[in-house]
Amino acid sequence: MTRQLLSQMVENNEGHIINIGSTAGIYAYAGAAVYAATKSAVKVLSDGIRIDTIDKNIKVTTLQPGIVETDFSQVRFHGDKERAATIYQGIDALQANDIASCTLFVANQPAHVQISDITIMATKQATSFT
């Protein structure tokens, strides 16, 4: 999507790109090396775009959520709901609306304020997997 919109933002001399990464891009975990690498790349790509467009009034933000209760774990574990449920044991996982609230917070800052990144975790989460 950024590829499609960035040229228009440059032409208009304004815009805001908000990319969704993951704490897995900060804290890798077993069995997810490729996923962690791609999420790390989201942050680096965002930083690069911010640098490349610094004179164009384009903000670039990376949101890096931790454990969010979605279908992600069921997909990861090929439909094994019991195994997927273990991911959330003992953690009051983030919900999609928590990420949406952070996105709105970032998007609604004054023109002179750029939030480069936010890492969002559940209260009982310390890394991408605990």
Which residues does each predicted region cover?
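Conserved SDR Rossmann-fold cofactor-binding beta-strand/turn motif
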Residues: K59-E69
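Short, flexible, mixed-charge acidic loops at enzyme active sites
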Residues: S73-E82
